[in-house]
Amino acid sequence: MNLLSPPRRRTLAVLGAVLLAACSPSGPKFEASDITGSSFGRDFSLEDPKGVTRSLADFRGKAVVLFFGYTQCPDVCPTTLATLAQAMQRLGPDADRVQVLFVTIDPERDTPALLAQYVPAFDPRFLGLRGDAAATARTAKEFKILYEKVPGATPGSYTMDHSAGTYIFDPKGRLRLYVAYGQGPDVYAHDLKRLLDASS
């Protein structure tokens, strides 16, 4: 993934400041930014690799980890998915109460078959989701995700600039946390454990 342009970096910095300001002073203590009560990120309607339309309601009862990326991403996406796989290992049996979702921002190249191969390679419980160009744009807007195609040497060799953070929902389907890119598996495992314990 290429670095975002200065205006986009400023936009993300502003968003980060807003997210930090939203931290709740009470309740469980999280390592990530507590964004409980946010008015964005309410839901999505996307298809899994089998063509089944999915929304947050399908995963009620589980903590949901939502990440936006693309399969040909050279760094951020595989790093984040590998980190999440390590977090699942740290959670032990509790990992079965967590659903990691990978939403592609490159539906042009990320076919259902490719998502079915790529995403579970990190952990067989991980699920890839996609929509057409309009659904992708609509979902990205709902979750304040920035993405942009960066032309390559050939029409099919483009890359994608995109926001690199991760969202976490509690088992009741409420958006609770924003995890900045670069956080390790212990941060995810710690915060997911707290959300799961609070819902027990």
Task: Kindly give the residue locations of the regions a language model identified.
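A short beta-strand-turn-helix
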Residues: 44-64
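N-terminal secretory signal peptides and thylakoid transit peptides that target proteins
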Residues: 2-18
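C-terminal motif of bacterial Sec signal peptides marking the signal peptidase cleavage site
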Residues: 20-22
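Short loop/turn microsegments at loop-to-beta-strand junctions
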Residues: 41-42, 64, 163-165
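Bacterial signal peptide processing site
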Residues: 24-27
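Structural microenvironment flanking redox-active thiols in thiol-disulfide oxidoreductases
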Residues: 79-139
